[in-house]
Amino acid sequence: NRLAGGIVLRRQDPGLSGTGGLMDPHLLRKLNAARRDRQAAILITGLEDGRNRLVMRGDPVAGDLGAAIGKAFLSGKSGTVEADGQRFFLNVHLPSPRMVIIGAVHISQALAPMAAMTGFDVKVIDPRTAFATEERFEGVDLVADWPEDTLNDQPLDAFTALVAVTHDPKIDDWPLISALKAQAFYVGALGSRKTHARRVERLTQAGVSGQEIARIAAPIGLDIGAQSPSEIAVAILAQTVLALRRPVDTAASGQRVSDT
């Protein structure tokens, strides 16, 4: 049996939109499960026949429709496309991107509000209570605790950016490893090339593969000649957006902020 009625969206849930097609209850349950689990999905409706199908990110789809789906996953925009001689409505469902910043430092003070304005759900984590104060991070989701204690309850995922800026391996290394295992879309770490070389040694000893380590953007940020904490924050945010919208090997792109 098919669910009577079209795909109707309420105002309080802007992630759904109406196409007028009938939706199979099984697809609806699958879509709701994907949204609950923060997985990317596109509901495809054939505008000629009204048939629906759900495609998860990574599912193989051939032809022009597959290319259109790939672009829609990157842009996050729903809309009508013509592919393979037919017209389809692509209803895109992407989890809200998150940014977890490890370290309540000056760079973080600039980065957190800018990232929030860009659309990221931002969290700053630092066990050092002298740094992690509400006075320094007014209006920011701030956790004065060890990253492993916080992130075990709120795991990282593929729609999370991890930015490690404490310069302290006791604080940075665990979330970096967790972000790589979770396939976070962006993993960046502050530090010079010498600092990163020592980091690579530690992560290798911890069992992280060279391929995984190569995903770390270090030194962090696009190479815009940044000097001040605010400028470095701009470079980090730009590199994060690049990784979100153009998911290539950002860490191997050679686009860095500095060696500091």
What are the functions of these language-model segments?
Residues R2-L3:
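Compositionally biased, low-complexity intrinsically disordered regions
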Residues G6-V143, D157-T160, T195, V241-T260:
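Segments forming oxygen-rich coordination pockets for charged ligands
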Residues E148-D157:
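Short amphipathic alpha-helix with an adjacent loop that forms part of the alpha/beta core around
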Residues T166-P169:
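N-terminal glycine-rich "phosphate-gripper" loop used for MgATP/nucleotide binding
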Residues I171-A184:
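Rossmann-fold NAD(P) dinucleotide-binding segment
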Residues L190-T260:
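Adenosine-phosphate binding glycine-rich loop
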